[in-house]
Regions:
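Conserved catalytic submotifs in the C-terminal HATPase_c
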Residues: 47-58
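Acidic ATP/Mg2+-coordinating residue in the GHKL
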Residues: 107
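Conserved glycine-/histidine-rich ATP-lid loop and adjacent helix of the Bergerat-fold HATPase_c
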Residues: 146-155
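Short beta-strand/loop element within the Bergerat-fold HATPase_c
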Residues: 88-99
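Short conserved segment of the HATPase_c
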Residues: 112-126
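Glycine-rich ATP-binding loops of the HATPase_c
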Residues: 155-162
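Conserved DHp (HisKA) dimerization/phosphotransfer helix of two-component histidine kinases, i.e.
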Residues: 1-46
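Glycine-rich phosphate-binding loop
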Residues: 135-146
Length: 175
């Protein structure tokens, strides 16, 4: 089940229609990626609470861009939980729409690694906190960089809302 979910995520990223900018309801795209990741979330004992207002967040997008944002956020949270003692593992994704799509993402893990003196370093290409038991780098340093680059590509912005006792990120993208 875990492998099937992983393969679905990877193959969905390369489908032809996802490489064309189409008018999409971004809420649906986010909900879809959460559902695809559900087997991994269940295996890792992580609950995702997806809260949406009654609006439609429609915009011409490359659907794979938004899948990538949420895939990276969720996988980072799962990996952070695996290194923490958090028992009741939760991710909360709150979606609101006004003239912007506003995403408030929050997990209840340990927060950012202390290695980051400036927390915004996490958005730098090559910046990682993933190491094996021998201290060798195993992270690519691409995930948060991809998120930041994609948000900027859509003329949006982002800010860290929590870096200790959990990780929080607010994303705003004009519609």
């Amino acid at each position: 089940q875990f492998l099937k979910s992983w393969i679905t995520v990877v193959t969905n990223q390369s489908k032809k229609d996802k490489r064309k900018r189409l008018k999409k309801n971004i809420y649906d795209t986010i909900e879809k990626i959460v559902n695809v990741l559900q087997p991994i979330l269940v295996q890792k004992k992580v609950q995702v609470e997806l809260i949406k207002d009654e609006q439609n967040a429609e915009r011409r997008i490359f659907e794979s861009d938004f899948e990538s944002i949420f895939y990276n956020l969720i996988i980072n949270s799962i990996e952070a939980f695996s290194k923490s003692s958090t028992k009741n593992r939760k991710i909360r994704i709150e979606l609101k729409t006004n003239e912007n799509l506003v995403v408030n993402y929050l997990d209840n893990g340990d927060g950012l690694d202390n290695k980051f003196k400036n927390p915004y370093e996490i958005f730098t290409l090559g910046s990682t906190s993933k190491y094996d038991q021998f201290g060798n780098v195993i992270g690519t340093g691409l995930g948060m960089y991809i998120i930041a680059s994609t948000v900027r590509e859509y003329n949006g912005d982002y800010k860290l809302t929590q870096i200790q006792n959990g990780f929080g990120l607010e994303i705003r993208i004009p519609l």
